[in-house]
């Protein structure tokens, strides 16, 4: 008999009635034969890569052409092939600027803004004072700049790398948004597409794979595009897409074996969406293990979230929480029978992680994963306790707990553990206890989730979100609560940018997962993860289904 059928039917459960999977077993059709990368494709990619490398080498560092070339390569999603060259070039560009900044009289907004964004994107602090020359005595940007659409667009993109206290960039953001929106309908199709995409989602807060997929289409329609670069970007995307399709096929088989419909019918069926989350953090060929591990973790998190949120009773959750903290097979007998399949998946996950890390001589990393897991599962029980006792906590108390339940920190630490890079104990400790970027990323994930999901959640018995907490504590309207949540998200992005620019003792590969986890939730317009039949479905189709060579792409 189904274990769920054996559960006491007199118990009232706050079922969420989630829709069935959009994808089902679709990706099982991507067999190893269909996703095989041919020797001809590999050879052609290497030949094109060498030609693009020559373009980079032959273009002088301190030229506008070099800035545009690097920007194009990054947008097309192929910069990972040339990381070292780009790093050195941007360093040279920054050094030259610093040496001559008092003599610098560059009045080309397009160049100044692009250079600013690329330099900050490589973690060099270039002062926002470079934009002062484009303002009047009253600190407002000159209206004559509205004739330079590309300059406005570059300035708009640059503003998203601002840190606290940069009022000139706040002014620049308001100025560029106002004018880009008003002029967009009058632009030619190619420029209109760039402006529309930027206003919808700026580069800095978008995930690299989505940027690449959409920019390939935009770049193809720019008359001055470079055919060689476009061909390279398309082939590279095609090869990575095959690899991602194969991984999705393997993970779909794993998911099918878990028997979701019988063992976890109360939970969302989101395997493909979980993989999308993983690829948003790591898309490169060297990160296959990281994507697989992270996907499995997010699947476990999703089922657990629905268990605590939409099915189990408080009395069932107390022993389950204790069992997860113990992480031992002997705890199995202490939990309800219907919870045991999920607990077994949880144990298998950690066994697999430990086995793989032991091969790498990094078994001690598992300690950090288990510490974060224990914090996470206890925070879920705290939310269940609040719900049981009809407690709406103060905003700060809510955030302390809810930024753990959102699981961002656990995902982040897992990324660092399984990515394959060496990370010192000091770096782990810094990320967990001292960084701005980790708590800021968690806060963005939590508040964005509360903004887009709380109306749906309040239709059933559910714990308070930040919105309800703020309304109660400050006797505010829901609209005022939304405004405050968005203000805190904006400030959290400034914290992320601050660490990215100033935590120079920490390698970039340590910070990028936190940045990408923030980007992932930032691109969701509604509760797309839960109700993934619209925007997220279209995005997944772009990345994993549609051919990049299709005339209807994007």
Curated annotation (Swiss-Prot):
Signal peptide: none annotated. SUPFAM superfamilies: Terpenoid cyclases/Protein prenyltransferases, Terpenoid synthases. Mg(2+) 1 binds at residues 305, 309. Its EC number is 4.2.3.79, 4.2.3.-, 4.2.3.47, 4.2.3.59. Binds 3 Mg(2+) or Mn(2+) ions per subunit. Mg(2+) 2 binds at residues 305, 309. A motif (DDXXD motif) lies at residues 305-309. The keyword Aminoacyl-tRNA synthetase does not apply. This is Sesquiterpene synthase 14b. The lineage of its organism: Eukaryota, Viridiplantae, Streptophyta, Embryophyta, Tracheophyta.
């Amino acid at each position: 008999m189904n274990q769920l059928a054996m559960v006491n039917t007199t118990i009232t459960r706050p079922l969420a009635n989630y829709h069935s999977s959009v994808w089902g077993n679709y990706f099982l059709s991507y067999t190893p034969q269909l996703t095989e990368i041919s020797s001809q494709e590999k050879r052609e990619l290497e030949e094109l890569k060498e030609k693009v490398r020559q373009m980079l080498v032959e273009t002088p560092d301190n030229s506008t052409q070099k800035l545009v070339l690097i920007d194009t390569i990054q947008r097309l999603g192929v910069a990972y092939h040339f990381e070292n060259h780009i790093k050195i070039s941007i360093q040279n560009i920054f050094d030259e600027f610093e040496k001559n900044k008092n003599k610098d009289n560059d009045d080309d907004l397009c160049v100044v803004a692009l250079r600013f964004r690329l330099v900050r994107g490589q973690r060099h602090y270039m002062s926002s004072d470079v934009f002062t020359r484009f303002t009047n005595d009253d600190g407002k940007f000159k209206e004559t700049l509205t004739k330079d659409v590309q300059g406005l667009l570059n300035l708009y993109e640059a503003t998203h790398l601002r840190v606290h206290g940069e009022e000139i960039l706040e002014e620049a953001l308001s100025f560029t948004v106002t004018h880009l929106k008003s002029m967009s309908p009058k632009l030619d199709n190619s420029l209109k597409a760039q402006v529309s995409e930027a206003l919808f989602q700026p580069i800095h807060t978008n995930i690299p794979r989505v940027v690449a997929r959409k920019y390939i289409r935009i770049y193809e329609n720019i008359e001055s595009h470079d055919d060689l670069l476009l061909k390279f970007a398309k082939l590279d995307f095609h090869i990575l897409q095959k690899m991602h399709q194969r991984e999705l096929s393997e993970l779909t088989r794993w998911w099918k074996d878990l028997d979701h419909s019988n063992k976890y019918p109360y939970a969302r069926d989101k395997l493909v969406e979980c993989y999308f989350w993983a690829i948003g953090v790591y898309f490169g060929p060297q990160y296959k293990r990281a994507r697989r591990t992270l996907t499995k973790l997010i699947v476990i998190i999703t089922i657990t979230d629905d268990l605590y949120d939409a099915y189990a009773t408080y009395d069932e959750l107390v022993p389950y929480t204790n069992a997860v903290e113990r992480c031992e097979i002997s705890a199995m007998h202490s939990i309800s029978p219907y919870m045991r399949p999920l607990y077994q998946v949880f144990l298998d996950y950690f066994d697999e992680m430990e086995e793989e890390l032991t091969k790498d001589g990094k078994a001690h990393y598992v300690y950090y994963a288990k510490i974060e897991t224990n914090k996470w599962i206890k925070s879920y029980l705290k939310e269940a306790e609040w719900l049981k006792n009809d407690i709406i906590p103060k905003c700060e108390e809510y955030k302390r707990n809810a930024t753990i339940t959102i699981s961002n920190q656990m995902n982040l630490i897992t990324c660092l553990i399984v990515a394959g890079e060496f990370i010192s104990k000091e770096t782990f400790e810094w990320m967990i206890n001292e960084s701005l970027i980790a708590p800021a990323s968690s806060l963005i994930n939590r508040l964005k989730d509360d903004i887009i999901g709380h109306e749906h959640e309040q239709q059933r018995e559910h714990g308070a979100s930040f919105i309800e907490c703020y309304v109660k504590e400050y006797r505010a309207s829901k609209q005022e609560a939304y405004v405050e949540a968005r203000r805190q998200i904006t400030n959290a992005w400034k914290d992320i940018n601050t660490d990215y620019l100033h935590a120079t003792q920490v390698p970039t590969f340590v910070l990028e997962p936190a940045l990408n986890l923030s980007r992932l939730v930032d691109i969701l317009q509604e509760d797309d993860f839960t109700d993934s039949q619209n925007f997220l479905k279209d995005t997944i189709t772009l990345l994993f289904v549609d051919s990049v060579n299709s005339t209807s792409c994007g």
